[in-house]
């Protein structure tokens, strides 16, 4: 399905170009397995030069919920991570404490979530530009903060959701997501947002084979389960 979808409001899908790179995960220039998370300071840039990073054999705990200490990279507010491959041996991929920028970050096999964004405020923006993720049985991008996430020219294959606004965070809020030029194959939802909290989603130039690329939920706060309540577009 080639689509341009916005919610709210919803636009009629049209055929447009998508630019997610479909040539597979780049060949790494080096491989590093680290026993601890790599922290990138606020406002700093970490350019991996196309090396692969992971946390060593057995790091993935089969969907056990982890925190930032289980991640491969932990980005403080305003930090940038670029030109890197996150290997399969990890429980969490990248955690952002506040808005961050990811440029050409690839995930060869997602364990729990590839990217988790938290503590961003309304009006702050996170950018995920290029790159892609494979084999994310649950979510690629988990958004727990209250800002806007922009996903541009991304590639996803074999996934549950490309983006999910947190369904049951203790402190809920309105979140926004913008997806453009992205390719999503063999998966579920491109975006899942909470209708009852006023979330917004815009999908432009997205190529996806999902029956319903944009899905509405009723979110909740705390120890509860959000409920699927409809679709942003047919």
Curated annotation (Swiss-Prot):
<dbReference type="Pfam" id="PF03211">
    <property type="entry name" value="Pectate_lyase"/>
</dbReference>
<dbReference type="InterPro" id="IPR012334">
    <property type="entry name" value="Pectin_lyas_fold"/>
</dbReference>
<keyword id="KW-0624">Polysaccharide degradation</keyword>
<comment type="similarity">
    <text>Belongs to the polysaccharide lyase 3 family.</text>
</comment>
<dbReference type="InterPro" id="IPR011050">
    <property type="entry name" value="Pectin_lyase_fold/virulence"/>
</dbReference>
<keyword id="KW-0732">Signal</keyword>
<protein>
    <recommendedName>
        <fullName>Probable pectate lyase F</fullName>
        <ecNumber>4.2.2.2</ecNumber>
    </recommendedName>
</protein>
<feature type="signal peptide">
    <location>
        <begin position="1"/>
        <end position="17"/>
    </location>
</feature>
<dbReference type="InterPro" id="IPR004898">
    <property type="entry name" value="Pectate_lyase_PlyH/PlyE-like"/>
</dbReference>
<keyword id="KW-0456">Lyase</keyword>
<dbReference type="GO" id="GO:0045490">
    <property type="term" value="P:pectin catabolic process"/>
</dbReference>
<dbReference type="GO" id="GO:0030570">
    <property type="term" value="F:pectate lyase activity"/>
</dbReference>
<comment type="function">
    <text>Pectinolytic enzyme consist of four classes of enzymes: pectin lyase, polygalacturonase, pectin methylesterase and rhamnogalacturonase. Among pectinolytic enzymes, pectin lyase is the most important in depolymerization of pectin, since it cleaves internal glycosidic bonds of highly methylated pectins. Favors pectate, the anion, over pectin, the methyl ester.</text>
</comment>
<dbReference type="GO" id="GO:0071555">
    <property type="term" value="P:cell wall organization"/>
</dbReference>
<keyword id="KW-0119">Carbohydrate metabolism</keyword>
<dbReference type="GO" id="GO:0005576">
    <property type="term" value="C:extracellular region"/>
</dbReference>
<keyword id="KW-0961">Cell wall biogenesis/degradation</keyword>
<keyword id="KW-0964">Secreted</keyword>
<keyword id="KW-0106">Calcium</keyword>
């Amino acid at each position: 399905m080639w689509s341009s979808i916005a919610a709210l409001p919803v636009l009629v899908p049209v055929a447009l170009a998508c630019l997610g790179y479909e040539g597979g995960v780049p060949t790494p220039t080096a491989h590093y397995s680290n026993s601890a998370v790599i922290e990138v300071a606020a406002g700093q840039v970490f350019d991996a030069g196309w090396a692969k990073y992971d946390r060593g054999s057995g790091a993935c705990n089969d969907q056990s919920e982890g925190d930032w200490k289980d991640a491969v990279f932990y980005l403080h507010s305003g930090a940038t991570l670029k030109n890197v491959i996150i290997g399969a041996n990890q429980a969490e991929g990248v955690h952002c404490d506040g808005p961050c920028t990811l440029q050409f970050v690839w995930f060869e096999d997602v364990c729990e979530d590839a990217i988790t964004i938290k503590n961003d405020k309304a009006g702050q923006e996170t950018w995920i530009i290029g790159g892609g993720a494979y084999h994310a049985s649950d979510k690629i991008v988990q958004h727990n903060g209250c800002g806007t996430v922009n996903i541009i020219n991304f590639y996803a294959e074999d996934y549950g959701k490309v983006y999910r606004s947190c369904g049951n965070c203790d402190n809920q809020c309105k979140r926004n997501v913008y997806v453009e030029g992205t390719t999503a194959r063999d998966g579920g939802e491109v975006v899942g947002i909470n209708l009852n909290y006023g979330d917004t989603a815009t999908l432009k130039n997205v190529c996806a084979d999902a029956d319903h690329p944009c899905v509405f939920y009723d979110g909740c706060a705390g120890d509860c389960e959000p409920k699927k309540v409809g679709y942003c577009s047919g």
